[in-house]
Amino acid sequence: MGTISASLVKELREKTGAGMMDCKEALTACDGDIEKAVDFLRQKGLAKAAKRSGRETSEGIVESYIHMGGKIGVMVEVNCESDFVAKTDDFKEFARNVAMQIAATNPAGIAPEDVPADLLERERQVYRAQVLEMGKPENMVDKIVDGKIKKFFKESCLIEQQYVKNPDITIGDYLNETVAKIGESIRIKRFARFALGE
């Protein structure tokens, strides 16, 4: 494909929120294929996010969300590098969506290292008993249990979870896309989820 039309660049910008030149570069690299260009920009965004991940995040907001007629409530602290970014609609939307994700999925922690050791050990023991009950050979038990623990992390760790609004990506992917979009490091610092009667 020779030249990339302005309408194609505009369509990609609307889909991804990326800058005009980034969209043009992605479309050129992907011969005008918009779906490949979206993936190209996502990969580029991950690289940008990795570069920014070491920066200090001392600004941000505490977002709250009340769900199901007041029966579930969430507070989440999301940090960024500057007060300016903390006030943007993109950042506020990210914090709001993360709070909604927490309300919907009740994660055990933000990342695998945040899952309480006693909960992890209890899960490991349950999985081990299940695998032994299935009659699997002893030399395979630990590998199978490790696989089940990885699945547990995908379900129980916020960053590893599928994003409920777009199951094709994880919350970690969504965070990286938002970092690429706003140009600053973002960190989900902590959260609390309350459910009536729990």
Curated annotation (Swiss-Prot):
Keyword Protein biosynthesis assigned: yes
One Gene Ontology CC term in the entry: cytoplasm
Keyword Protein biosynthesis recorded: yes
Pfam families according to UniProt: EF_TS (PF00889)
InterPro entries found in the cross-reference section: EF-Ts_dimer_sf, Transl_elong_EFTs/EF1B, Transl_elong_EFTs/EF1B_dimer, Transl_elong_Ts_CS, UBA-like_sf
UniProt keyword list: Cytoplasm, Elongation factor, Protein biosynthesis
One MF annotation (Gene Ontology) recorded for this entry: translation elongation factor activity
Location within or outside the cell: Cytoplasm
Main subcellular location: cytoplasm
Superkingdom of origin: Bacteria
Positions of the UniProt region annotated as Involved in Mg(2+) ion dislocation from EF-Tu: 82-85
NCBIfam families named in the record: tsf (TIGR00116)
Main function: Associates with the EF-Tu.GDP complex and induces the exchange of GDP to GTP. It remains bound to the aminoacyl-tRNA.EF-Tu.GTP complex up to the GTP hydrolysis stage on the ribosome.
Homology family: Belongs to the EF-Ts family.
Protein name as it appears in the record: Elongation factor Ts
Protein encoded by which gene: tsf
